Amino acid sequence: ELKNILLQDKDQYYQTFFKKDFEVRKINNINDYLKIISKSVCDYHSSEKKKIIDSIEKINTQIKKIKNKYPQFHFIHLDKFLSLPWKFGLVCSKKYENGLPHTRQQYIIFEKKYLENISQKSLMKTLIHEKVHVYQKMYPQDIQYYLNHHQFKKIKPRESKDLIRANPDLDNFIYHDKHFNTYKAVYNNDAINLEDITYFPHDTQFYEHPFEQMAIKFEKIIN
């Protein structure tokens, strides 16, 4: 099922690639990438499933405790968050999206070695972070409230000349905050992979995009 989702590209993620996005993935076109993806998808082993399930159970327990006191956290309705189904995919190669955790439609995608090596505490934070991105896709109106409250404004769509990294967890717009700081992750001049970027206005992922900022803030729901 994951292979079909990645190959069909119904979320049109590959359509957001510009010249630099192709270069850092070492591909000439989308067909090259589809061939790589076909060989990258794999199945979860029972140990990997257990690691994820154990983490989800702890997450749900903690959020349920908080929910009675705070029905919302950073503009995310906790009932809605808990009711969103967890869907996962696994890839066995860093050739697809450099092995970075991300979402495609409602699926959270991990790379096998990343999942093997991550601690449970870090996995819990990553799971929450990525589920926020699923929530953002499912409930755009809630996200608009967040953007309005924090006075984020859309400036323009991303263009090739901006050299901003394509990211399946984000929309394809550039935003600035109430202080007119423009948020972006820009490829370095000598970039050879997806992670060769610099964040602006400050070099931390918090400033890549308002959607990333929201997800990073929400991670703090667990301690």
Regions found by a protein language model. Name each.
Residues 1-49, 215:
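N-terminal mature-domain "stem" immediately C-terminal to a signal peptide or N-terminal signal-anchor/transmembrane
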Residues 30-108:
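Auxiliary, metal-adjacent structural segments of Zn-dependent hydrolase domains
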Residues 52, 56, 120-125, 208-212:
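Solvent-exposed, acidic/flexible segments
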Residues 87-92, 125, 136, 141:
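Non-catalytic terminal regions of proteins
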Residues 90-94, 112-114, 132, 136:
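Short, flexible loop/turn elements at secondary-structure junctions
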Residues 109-127:
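Short pre-active-site segment immediately N-terminal to the catalytic Zn-binding motif
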Residues 130-148:
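Catalytic Zn2+-binding segment of zinc metalloproteases
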Residues 148-223:
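Metalloprotease/metallohydrolase-associated module, dominated by Zn2+-dependent proteases
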